[in-house]
Amino acid sequence: MTERRDNVSHAPDAIEGPNDGAHAEDTSPGFFSLENLGVAQVQVVGGTLNGYVIGYVAVYLLLYLTATECKFTTEGACGGRKIYGCKWSGTTCKFENPKCSEGSDPSDSCKNEVAYTSVYSGIFACAMIVGSMVGSIIAGKCITTFGLKKSFIIVSITCTIACVVVQVAIEYNNYYALCTGRVLIGLGVGILCSVFPMYVNENAHPKLCKMDGVLFQVFTTLGIMLAAMLGLILDKTGASKEEANMAGRLHVFSAVPLGLSVAMFLVGMFLRESTATFAQDDDGKADGGMDPNEYGWGQMLWPLFMGAVTAGTLQLTGINAVMNYAPKITENLGMDPSLGNFLVMAWNFVTSLVAIPLASRFTMRQMFITCSFVASCMCLFLCGIPVFPGVAGKEVKNGVATTGIALFIAAFEFGVGSCFFVLAQDLFPPSFRPKGGSFVVMMQFIFNILINLLYPITTEAISGGATGNQDKGQAVAFILFGLIGLICSVLQFFYLYPYDANQDHENDHGGEPVEQKTYPVEASPRN
């Protein structure tokens, strides 16, 4: 296994020509071959679950808002679910404990409780991410202790339990149980985000390794789009929202992750064992396995730092704010919330498909740095500055911001999101990847928490409260996203290089060290 990883090109600045490696092309499996699909299937199931869990927040908040508005026109829809604070009175659905008297002018001191407050929304959005952060911390130990295949089963069982807890929480409208379920499913997702990319990185054919690697993000965006599409269907079709059983719709919406968790269990049961194994004896040097203690944390400080920078690029440039609050953002731009959310997620998926052919031609480093720079510019110059009140008229602002969000998502999916999970592995030597990859994934979840918790609260505060001009807070947020992204892009241009096995090899034999800026591994098309 290690020999395959160390067999890299020695032409630092060259890309293989059409006649180079012809023999490898003749013997390598096709992208859609059964051999390759046997490896890539983990990306299909794991990525889709990861994406659906991410896209869950925006849709759930939208459906819950409808459930708590108490605008139902039938007794069954209103009185049947008193847990949402509604009661049927004569011929009208009313709030069970209204803060406002009939005919009063709703002011800041008179508002019936509808949906979640910005604080509760932020906590709900962060619950899964907190669990994911914990999961990513233990992912490395899980991999070295149980192996990759058994880790799949652990993830599936954890996610299944979490989905059951969420269903119970919906039935009784229990906010704390809902957040508990989200934390549990986040725990599974945190392990998943390290285990699945590592399995593909270690078991896919070298020619297809990076193309298979970006599939995790492709199917993550598919899962996000599926959540948005189902949300649109539940919000717009069938019985009208004024007559619908919204609790039932929330149950249906929350059942999809349960099915994906069961599918993941089946994949884990029948998946072939990974070629990557780790030593389990006290000395860490059992035959046939890599030593997980071969490198100490101190030896990997610089790759760990650059991993944290890539995680910052992934999360602090605004993608999660767009994903979780797409309905609100698109509503501020004059669109229907559920339709706007679906269009954003559909575009997110379509653009991610472009990463597959790009990965066969360009390196992960080239794609990541170029696209992070472009995405940051979109945040700053199209989504931020023009949206600030007074800079542009309403029609111009909406048009420019919509274009900016579309281009930002495209740039992000072309190279930032698609390459991140591959780089999280490639930055480190094979034996350190359980620790190093888990650390990088953990950092992106930490940044994710900051965005999910602070974005709604900060934008509302900057805008002057819930009744203020929300464009102001949104503009300031995207300006900051753009500036952070540009700083990270500069650091990555000078210092982001995947691990080079040849450097260790030459140092072990007394040769001259290979300079970090000329890593031969980066010249290979599979990187």
Swiss-Prot record:
Q: Does the keyword Glycoprotein apply?
A: no
Q: What PROSITE patterns does this protein's entry cite?
A: MFS
GO CC, one annotated term: membrane
Give the transmembrane ranges: 44-64, 119-139, 152-172, 176-196, 214-234, 250-270, 300-320, 339-359, 373-393, 404-424, 437-457, 476-496
Q: Which Gene3D superfamilies match?
A: MFS general substrate transporter like domains
Q: What is its main location?
A: membrane
Give the GO molecular function terms: hexose transmembrane transporter activity
Basic and acidic residues composition-biased segments: 506-515
Topology term for the membrane: Multi-pass membrane protein
Report keywords, A-Z: Membrane, Sugar transport, Transmembrane, Transmembrane helix, Transport
What is this protein's function per UniProt?
Answer: Facilitative glucose transporter.
Recorded family membership: Belongs to the major facilitator superfamily. Sugar transporter (TC 2.A.1.1) family.
- Protein name, per record: Glucose transporter 1B/1C/1D/1F/2B
